[in-house]
Design a protein with these regions (language model features):
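Alpha/beta-hydrolase active-site loop
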Residues: 120-142
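Alpha/beta-hydrolase fold nucleophile elbow
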Residues: 143-152
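Serine-hydrolase catalytic-loop signature spanning alpha/beta hydrolases and amidase-signature enzymes
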Residues: 80, 85-88, 92-93, 109, ...
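Short beta-strand element of the alpha/beta-hydrolase
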Residues: 55, 73-84
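Short beta-to-alpha linker loops that shape the active-site pocket of alpha/beta-hydrolase fold enzymes
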Residues: 61, 113-117
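Short amphipathic alpha-helix adjacent to the substrate-entry channel of hydrolases
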Residues: 91-111
Length: 152
């Protein structure tokens, strides 16, 4: 038998009490950053079946951008999936984090804008992430990527 206290705790933590739209609006405020870091960025898309999955590429230098798009990549890559438990957040909310990671690590950062629940039930967000990883590993996102130099 579950105690009244435990029932109250479970009720408070249930998904029914999460205000998704309010949470998403608060997350959107994170992008209002006057100290935004300027790195080279490129928005592209990959496909999960018929669905286009937006992906943002962060290049630590102009040289990295040129190499990854035209000549063939020589930089290590970090494949990044933003937080939010498949329900909140976005690539835009993590823009500053990814830009700083690119600069601090001298890696190309690949950030995936996967679809969110509850509109898109699991495993749809995971499948969007897999589609981006597959495109990266098969050189569809960045030319001549060495799979041994990709960190997920």
């Amino acid at each position: 038998m579950i105690s009244k206290t435990m029932k109250a705790i479970l009720h408070a933590l249930s998904y029914g009490n999460i205000e998704l739209e309010s949470s998403r609006r608060m997350a959107d405020l994170k992008q209002l950053d006057a100290m935004r870091i300027f790195v080279k960025k490129l928005d592209v898309r990959v496909y999960n079946g018929e669905h286009e999955v937006p992906v943002r590429l962060y290049f630590p230098t102009e040289e990295a951008m040129q190499a990854g798009i035209v000549e063939g990549n020589t930089f290590p890559i970090l494949l990044f999936f933003h937080g939010g438990g498949w329900v909140t957040e976005s690539v835009e909310n993590y823009d500053r984090v990814c830009a700083r990671m690119a600069q601090a690590t001298a890696h190309i950062v690949v950030s995936v804008e996967y679809r969110l629940a509850p509109e898109h039930k699991f495993p749809v967000p995971l499948e969007d992430c897999y589609a981006a990883a597959k495109a990266l590993y098969t050189n569809q996102l960045i030319l001549n990527t060495d799979p041994e130099r990709i960190t997920i």
